[in-house]
Regions:
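NTP-dependent small-molecule kinase module
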Residues: 96-134
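ATP-dependent small-molecule kinase phosphotransfer cores
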Residues: 1-43
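Short glycine-rich anion-binding loops that position phosphate/pyrophosphate groups of nucleotides
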Residues: 43-45, 62-63
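Acidic, amphipathic alpha-helical patches
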Residues: 25, 46, 95
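Small/polar loops that bind or transfer phosphate-bearing groups
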Residues: 40-41, 58-59, 108-109
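Short, hinge-like loop/turn segments at secondary-structure boundaries
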Residues: 5-14, 56-58, 75-76, 125
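A glycine- and Lys/Arg-enriched "phosphate-lid" helix/loop adjacent to the NTP-binding pocket
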Residues: 50-98, 102-105, 128
Length: 134
């Protein structure tokens, strides 16, 4: 599955989901050994690749901000259709609970974008700092 149809037909999101291909993520890891790389999103089988990451970050957002951002973004139409919006609102608290359970670093994504980016880069840089084993 790459992208869902737009708008998604009724019940489509209940029947289909996103899956991640381990080989592609492994390739990304190999290609980015000397720099920070980010893989954004979630997939139903993400446990299959979790071991490849040094850090997992969960961007946490309140429902009102999520609604506003989905309605006003220009880079992706997902969330404007009522069924997509309902799915996003349902997934939002579930994702936080799942990632929190995996020890993810939680970042308040309801802040302005530049602040969120600074927070993500800051925690990523902290993981990259030499640990004395060089």
């Amino acid at each position: 599955m790459t992208d869902p149809p737009y708008p998604v037909p009724r019940g489509w999101l209940d029947r289909y989901g996103w899956a991640i291909v381990r080989e592609r993520v492994t390739s990304l890891v190999e290609e980015s050994r000397s720099r920070i790389a980010f893989l954004c999103g979630s997939a139903e089988n993400e446990a299959d690749v979790r071991d490849l990451f040094d850090l997992i970050v969960c961007l946490v957002i309140d429902e009102d901000t999520l609604r506003h951002r989905l309605a006003t973004r220009t880079t992706n139409a997902f969330g404007r259709h009522p069924e997509e919006l309902a799915a996003a609102l349902k997934w939002n608290p579930l994702m936080r609970a799942i990632y929190e359970g995996h020890g993810a670093t939680l970042i308040d994504a309801s802040k302005p974008l530049t602040d969120v980016v600074d927070d993500v880069v800051s925690v990523a840089d902290a993981v990259r700092e030499p640990r004395g084993d060089a």
